[in-house]
Amino acid sequence: MFDFMTLEKVWEKGPLVHNITNIVVANDSANGLLAIGASPIMASAKEEMDELAKMADVLVINIGTLDGELVTAMKIAGRAANVAGTPVVLDPVGVGATSYRRKVVQELLAEIQFTAIRGNAGELAAIAGEAWEAKGVDAGVGSADVLSIAEKVANEWSTVVIISGEVDVISDGTRFAKVANGSALLPRITGSGCLLSAVCGSFMAVQDDAFRASVEACASYAVASEYAEIELERKLPGSFRPQFLDALASWSVEKTRAKAKIQESGEHK
């Protein structure tokens, strides 16, 4: 099923990815999208959200650094994207960390139909209402079954769920996949998950099957990180960051197919 031709489609189409994202990761996210052939726009003024919805091929909403004006812009943009039939991705950064973040995410989920939600296990557990010891915006630890969390959130909100971790879990509520790729250096650079959300969005902009787009995006991204690590003389985050950007710029269908480790099932067992 996963031939990774979505990766080629991103290069061919160069989708316009509208990011309402956080101040920590905006630059890296924009450069990462440019590296894979997408066209990023980082805009958050509420006055232009309706107009941008008519232009963008996908909208990515990231709650990493919130304020009231930004939340208003997110809601306007999300509703406009729904009207336009544009895919919308939510990255609920640190949703379990504070009551304000939980409130904002619940409001966004109530007002916007999201094509996909991508986060770590702690963030998706918070949305699912499952007990989990999150550590700020990091995943933390918990005993809940990650597949069950993915299934619950996917079915409750009619969306594709992407739970990033040592093994990525992707589900649309009926289909499940695990991606067992990725460099151990990825979690040592800030914003790697936020960029993945944007990359998933760029794949959804050119592939109507959001589940397939998500699996192929996660695998392509993780495999690129492995190639980046191979090129390093020193396995350190400061060296890895630019090398990973280069790996994204030089990724290919052939490279991804050669190393992708995907386990797919039709149901949660």
Swiss-Prot record:
UniProt: ATP binding residues: 118, 164
Short name of one Pfam family: HK
Protein name: Hydroxyethylthiazole kinase
Catalysed transformations (reactions): 5-(2-hydroxyethyl)-4-methylthiazole + ATP = 4-methyl-5-(2-phosphooxyethyl)-thiazole + ADP + H(+)
Residue sites binding substrate per the record: 42, 191
EC numbers: 2.7.1.50
Record gene name: thiM
GO biological process per UniProt: thiamine biosynthetic process; thiamine diphosphate biosynthetic process
Obligatory cofactor(s): Mg(2+)
Function: Catalyzes the phosphorylation of the hydroxyl group of 4-methyl-5-beta-hydroxyethylthiazole (THZ).
Family of this protein: Belongs to the Thz kinase family.
Pathway noted in the entry: Cofactor biosynthesis; thiamine diphosphate biosynthesis; 4-methyl-5-(2-phosphoethyl)-thiazole from 5-(2-hydroxyethyl)-4-methylthiazole: step 1/1
Keywords recorded for this protein, A-Z: ATP-binding, Kinase, Magnesium, Metal-binding, Nucleotide-binding, Thiamine biosynthesis, Transferase
InterPro entries assigned: Hyethyz_kinase, Ribokinase-like
Alphabetized GO MF terms: ATP binding; hydroxyethylthiazole kinase activity; magnesium ion binding
